From Swiss-Prot:
TM helices/strands, residue ranges: none
Main localization, broad class: mitochondrion
Name under which the protein is recorded: L-2-hydroxyglutarate dehydrogenase, mitochondrial
Reactions it catalyzes: (S)-2-hydroxyglutarate + A = 2-oxoglutarate + AH2
Lineage: Eukaryota, Metazoa, Ecdysozoa, Nematoda, Chromadorea
Cofactor(s) required for function per UniProt: FAD
Record flagged with keyword Oxidoreductase: yes
Compartment(s) of residence: Mitochondrion
Enzyme class (EC, first level): oxidoreductase
Alphabetized UniProt keyword annotations: FAD, Flavoprotein, Mitochondrion, Oxidoreductase, Transit peptide
Length: 433
C-alpha cells in the first residue's frame, strides 16, 4: 500500500467544460499534465479500459514545466539509497522506457555515462557508489581506469570512473506528449487551460468529489482523484486537507551551452563523484538530442515556483520559501554552499573552472549561457531535502478516494512508467476500480 511515509504538441486539446446542471462525470480525474500524470493516466486505461478517465492541466499544453525543462537523461539508478522507491522504480523504469521507445519509435540515444573521480580523495566514494549500483541491480556497470576513460571520452581526465552503458538521452517533453496521445487514443480525455481551484465534497455517493476551476468556471464530478502536480503539489494536496509538510521549495538549475565548434569535446554524459555533504550532484556534461551539449547546472533558490530566470519573481512565492522553517534551517546548514552556487550562476567563469576538472582544455570562450529548469524539491520542517518519492492521501472524509504525488524529482522521468504501474495498482486496490 502507498502511504505518506514511503512515499504538469497538444495545445488546447480540449477546452474546459462549462458549468451546467449536468456536470461531466468521471470514474477518475488526474490533475497534472506532466510525465507522471500522463504516464499514470495511460496506464490506468491499459489495465482498466472500461474506466472513464480525465486529465486536467492548468497550462495550454502538456509538459510545460519540469517534464519539459530537464536534462533529458535516462538514468540507470546508480545514486539512490538501496531499497528506496527511487532505486527500485528507476531501475525498473529504465527498461520500461527503452521498451516503450523501441515499440513507439521514440528517438533516443544510449550515450552512456561516466562518473569520474579526478582526485584521490574521491576514489573511496566512487568505490562506495559502485557497490551501491550493484546492490540496486544496475546492469553492466563497470569500474574503469584512466586509460579506459580516455578511450571512451578522449578529452576527459580522471583517475577512475564508473561506466554506465545503459544511461541515455531522450526528449522527456516529447515522451510526455506521446503518453498523452496514447491516453486519448484509449478513450481518455485531456483538458488544458484548467487551473485547479478547489476539491470539495460533492454530497453525492455516486460521484463524491467535485473538482472546480476558478477562472474557467468549470467543474467535474468524479469518483476518485489522483494529483501529480509537480511544482504545485503541496498546494494542490492542501486543497483536500493534507498537511503542507513536506513543502515544495523550488530550486532553479542554470546551464551553460558548449559552442557548436567545441561539441567534439564531449561524447557521453560526464558526472562528478557526488559529495555526500551537499544535496545536489554537482556540475556535469550532458549531450542533448538536438546535438547541444549542456554544462552544469548550479542549484539556487528560484524566486518563483515556475520562474526560469533571475528576473522572474513572485514576491508571495519567495516569501513563502524564505519564511518556511525548513528553508531557514537548510540555509543555515549549507550557507557557504549556497553562496558558491549563486556565485557560479552570476560568474560563469567559476562554473567553467569546475568543469575544467574533467576536461582541462575547456575555455571560458567555449561556452555561452544556456537554458534553465526549476526542480520541485520537497523539504521537511527540519530543513532536510526529502530523498525519496512521497505519496499522500491526507485525512478526512474524502481521503480514501484521493492519492497525491507529493515529491517526484529526478529520476521521476526515467521512473515514470514504473511509477504509473505502482500508482495504478494502488488505485485499483484502494478505489476498487
Amino acid at each position: 500500500m502507498l502511504n505518506r511515509g514511503t512515499f504538469q504538441v497538444f495545445r488546447g486539446i480540449s477546452g474546459p467544460p462549462k458549468k451546467s446542471v449536468d456536470l461531466p462525470k468521471y470514474d477518475l480525474v488526474i490533475v497534472g499534465g506532466g510525465i507522471v500524470g500522463c504516464a499514470t493516466a495511460r496506464q490506468l486505461l491499459i489495465e482498466k479500459p472500461q474506466l472513464k478517465v480525465a486529465l486536467i492541466e492548468k497550462e495550454k499544453e502538456l509538459a510545460v514545466h519540469q517534464s519539459g525543462h530537464n536534462s533529458g537523461v535516462i538514468h540507470a539508478g546508480i545514486y539512490y539509497t538501496p531499497g528506496s522507491l527511487k532505486a527500485k522504480l528507476c531501475v525498473e523504469g529504465l527498461d520500461l522506457s527503452y521498451e516503450f521507445f523501441d515499440k513507439e519509435k521514440v528517438p533516443y540515444k544510449k550515450t552512456g555515462k561516466l562518473i569520474v573521480a579526478v582526485e584521490p580523495e574521491e576514489v573511496p566514494r566512487l568505490d562506495a557508489l559502485f557497490s551501491r549500483a550493484q546492490t540496486n541491480g544496475c546492469r553492466d556497470i563497470e569500474m574503469i581506469d584512466s586509460s579506459k576513460i580516455t578511450e571512451l571520452e578522449p578529452h576527459c581526465r580522471g583517475l577512475k570512473a564508473l561506466w554506465s552503458p545503459h544511461t541515455g538521452i531522450v526528449d522527456w517533453g516529447y515522451v510526455t506528449k506521446r503518453f498523452g496521445e496514447d491516453f486519448e487514443k484509449r478513450g481518455g480525455k485531456i483538458y488544458t487551460s484548467y487551473p485547479l481551484e478547489k476539491i470539495s465534497d460533492n454530497h453525492d455517493p455516486g460521484y463524491p468529489i467535485r473538482v472546480s476551476s476558478g477562472p474557467a468556471l468549470a467543474e467535474f464530478e468524479t469518483k476518485n482523484l489522483i494529483t501529480c502536480a509537480g511544482l504545485q503539489s503541496d498546494r494542490v494536496a492542501a486543497l483536500s486537507g493534507c498537511s503542507t509538510d513536506p513543502k515544495i521549495v523550488p530550486f532553479r538549475g542554470e546551464y551553460l551551452l558548449l559552442k557548436p565548434e567545441k561539441r567534439h569535446l564531449v561524447k557521453t554524459n560526464i558526472y562528478p563523484v557526488p559529495d555526500p555533504r551537499f544535496p545536489f550532484l554537482g556540475v556535469h556534461f550532458t549531450p542533448r538530442m538536438n546535438g547541444d551539449i549542456w554544462l552544469g547546472p548550479n542549484a539556487v533558490l528560484a524566486y518563483k515556483r515556475e520562474g526560469y530566470s533571475y528576473f522572474s519573481i513572485s514576491p508571495s512565492d519567495l516569501l513563502e520559501s524564505l519564511s518556511y522553517s525548513g528553508m531557514q534551517k537548510l540555509v543555515k546548514k549549507h550557507f557557504t554552499f549556497g553562496i558558491k552556487e549563486l556565485y557560479r550562476g552570476v560568474w560563469i567563469a567559476a562554473q567553467v573552472k569546475q568543469l575544467q576538472r574533467f576536461i582541462p582544455e575547456l575555455k571560458l570562450s567555449d561556452v555561452t549561457r544556456g537554458p534553465a529548469g526549476v526542480r520541485a524539491q520537497a523539504m521537511d520542517s527540519a530543513g532536510n531535502l526529502v530523498d525519496d518519492f512521497v505519496f499522500d492521501s491526507g485525512t478526512g472524509k474524502l481521503s480514501p478516494l484521493l492519492m497525491h504525488v507529493r515529491n517526484a524529482p529526478s529520476p521521476a522521468a526515467t521512473s515514470s512508467l514504473a511509477i504509473a504501474k505502482m500508482i495504478t495498482s494502488e488505485a485499483i486496490n484502494r478505489f476498487k476500480l
